[in-house]
């Protein structure tokens, strides 16, 4: 339930549940999660102002989590040239391969292109490697085959994104690896929980980081994960896109809807508990202007464009234009690529997909490919980076400013990297901290150092707009 609570999809669900009670009466609602930082608020999201009981199991899991910073070795030089990868990344790959010898391993990465980059280079390094790549842009059949092979033990390691973070039973997992920072403690806790999936078993995880800031952020998150300091779920307050979506959907389904029924039902949904009659009137007026509904007295009915919107916007998941990718040798669909990436392709180009290299044969309604040997271009997918909580960024910055590594679950090598990083910044001048924003000036570049987490992205956009007009 934590995945829904803070999103527009969750707000859509909350109104939909209230609409369902009009048809079926009140019913039992059960929300499951292992990583809720604010159980009381999330329970309110699920049931509104109804009575609710929060059940927390008394059994605590044993967790073994450590941050590693594998050091490049001289033997990696040839591999660096062969794989076209930085020494630190090659060292991380080598460590991951060695660690996975412990048993069935899930190697989590944060993006689909990182999964592909790791998968194809692992296969180039070791063609007999027992690995599969798993992410949401691969076809359903490919993902199911990967899960089945892992369950049966014919594949030892799955390189995966959040596609395997929740819900799916992949059987026994001895070790969870996380490549670079997991970005927040709730996500790391969820991923770590995939290992040791039996009562009294220890969940074992290792975060493999490749550079200083990743090591620092990973160490802070690992500490928070082990101490149970999970980020609070922030419920979106009255997202208007959701409100418009549900009003249009409702009028399409019920033809005529009483305005008071709209108001009373929507207010019962927790994200819209502060919803007012004035809010409703403003939204109905807006939808009327764009021909999505018509208000006649106290009733609201669908507008001339409502049906088209309804069928094109059932979900609030952003709709990205994609095309299928088919293996010409087997005629099987292996996944989907964003059209923006496909526009730059021509027959003969090499691309990386499913951890392997493919040559583009034909581009029509779908992309036809055949297996290839040489390294190709990584696909580009439109998506959002996983946000970094403000509290994580603040703690990381304060520890760096103080040179304080106490209580961080990291190896000696990782600690040495952090200490060296702290000393190099101190030698350069002013140390950035939560109280001190610093600016680095390079030849054609300014870097603002401020520990705002993902909030810094908003600040960057505002500064860019003020300075450059975009």
Predicted regions and their residues:
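Generic beta-strand/beta-sheet core signal
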Residues: 32, 108-110, 160-161, 171, ...
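Active-site phosphate/pyrophosphate-binding segments
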Residues: 242-243, 247, 253-278, 417-448, ...
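Long, charged amphipathic helices and adjacent flexible linkers at domain junctions
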Residues: 233, 307-309, 425, 432
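Helicase motor core with emphasis on the C-terminal RecA-like subdomain
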Residues: 1-254, 260-296
């Amino acid at each position: 339930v934590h995945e829904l609570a803070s999103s527009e999809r969750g707000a859509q669900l909350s109104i939909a549940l209230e609409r369902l009670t009009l048809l079926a009466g009140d019913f039992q609602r059960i929300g499951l999660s292992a990583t809720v930082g604010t159980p009381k608020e999330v329970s309110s999201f699920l049931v509104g102002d109804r009575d609710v009981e929060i059940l927390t199991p008394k059994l605590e899991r044993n967790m073994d989590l450590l941050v590693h910073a594998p050091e490049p070795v001289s033997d990696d030089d040839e591999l660096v040239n062969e794989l076209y990868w930085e020494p630190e990344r090659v060292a991380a790959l080598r460590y991951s391969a060695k660690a996975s010898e412990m048993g069935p391993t899930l190697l989590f990465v944060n993006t689909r292109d990182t999964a592909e980059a790791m998968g194809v280079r692992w296969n180039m390094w070791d063609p007999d490697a027992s690995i599969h790549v798993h992410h949401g842009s691969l076809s359903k059949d490919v993902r199911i085959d990967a899960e089945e092979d892992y369950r049966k033990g014919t594949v030892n390691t799955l390189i995966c994104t959040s596609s395997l973070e929740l819900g799916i039973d992949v059987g026994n997992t001895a070790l969870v690896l996380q490549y670079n920072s997991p970005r927040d403690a709730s996500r790391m806790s969820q991923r770590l929980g995939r290992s040791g999936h039996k009562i009294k078993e220890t969940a074992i995880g290792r975060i493999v980081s490749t550079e200083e800031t990743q090591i620092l952020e990973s160490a802070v998150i690992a500490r928070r994960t082990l101490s149970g300091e999970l980020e609070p779920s922030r419920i979106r307050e009255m997202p208007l896109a959701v409100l418009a979506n549900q009003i249009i959907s409702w009028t399409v389904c019920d033809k005529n809807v009483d305005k008071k029924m709209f108001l009373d039902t929507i207010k019962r949904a927790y994200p819209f508990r502060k919803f007012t009659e004035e809010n409703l009137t403003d939204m109905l007026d807006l939808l009327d202007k764009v021909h999505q509904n018509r208000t006649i007295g106290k009733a609201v009915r669908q507008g001339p464009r409502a049906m088209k919107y309804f069928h094109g916007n059932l979900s609030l998941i952003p709709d990205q234009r994609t095309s299928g990718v088919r293996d010409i040798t087997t005629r099987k669909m292996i996944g989907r690529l964003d059209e923006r990436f496909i526009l730059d392709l021509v027959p003969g180009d090499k691309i990386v997909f499913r951890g392997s290299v493919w040559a583009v044969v034909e581009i029509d309604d779908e992309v036809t490919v055949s297996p290839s040997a040489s390294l190709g271009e990584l696909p580009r997918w439109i998506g959002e980076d996983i946000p970094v909580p403000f509290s994580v960024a603040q703690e990381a910055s304060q520890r760096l400013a103080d040179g304080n590594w106490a209580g961080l679950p990291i190896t000696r090598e990782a600690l040495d990297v952090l200490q060296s990083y702290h000393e190099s910044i101190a030698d350069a001048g002013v140390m950035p901290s939560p109280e001190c924003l610093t600016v680095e000036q390079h030849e054609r570049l300014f870097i603002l150092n401020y520990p705002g987490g993902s909030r810094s992205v908003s600040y960057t956009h505002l500064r860019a707009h003020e300075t450059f007009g975009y």
